[in-house]
Amino acid sequence: MNPLISVAELRSLSNPVLLCASMGPNPPTRGIPGSHLADLEGDFSDPSQDLPHTVPADLRGLFESYGVSDDTPVVVYDDQEGATAPRVWWLAKVAGVDARVLDGGLRAWTGQLAEFTPPPGGGTLTASPRPGLLRDQEEVKADGRLVVDARSAGRFAGTEPEPRPGLRPGHIPGSVNLPYPQVYDNGHLKSPEQLQQMFREVVGDRRDLTFSCGSGVTACVTALAATVAGYEDLAVYEGSWSEWGRA
């Protein structure tokens, strides 16, 4: 299934679950009518953990609380230039849910906006979860996969400061850099052909890729781009530089 969906395709869906992904201190209050807010600083992370944006313990139950069942169309979007929707899309994959990302995000929507509605509950998921889509630090050290870092070139090189305190500069040894904004063109993901060329230039002939960033959020942007480019053996390093870069 194509992980992207257009506005025209979205309008043709019957009773989709719409999730507006958000991260930061000022979440939006309105979105596509019928949407629910998917707050990466709230329900869609585990604040009891010492790393930011850790996956909630009951991920399947979380999606069920938003009314998601095995046959429910799920569409994720954001109003943050595509930085956050892919994270919710990836979490859905981990939970066994085949969601899609609205190409162009909220900016591509030309209809009216409405206030978000609370999670309705009532979902039932029986599909098998896919926990292997997330990797911990020991797995990243041991599995020999190529790590693709989605942070800026300056943060990767250690010439720009980290936004979170207590982290040293630099990158995971042996990793390569693909800053996540480069996969977008005016808010839309670049074409599969453009993304294929981009990944060939960065990863060569490697197909086993683990994506990292600051806290596992924008790593999912490059994971989405790799999926569109035809890569399949993909994972996200959950702790990312927030864990690896601890001083």
Each PLM stretch: what is its role?
Residues 1-247:
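Cytosolic catalytic domains that perform sulfur/thiol-centered chemistry
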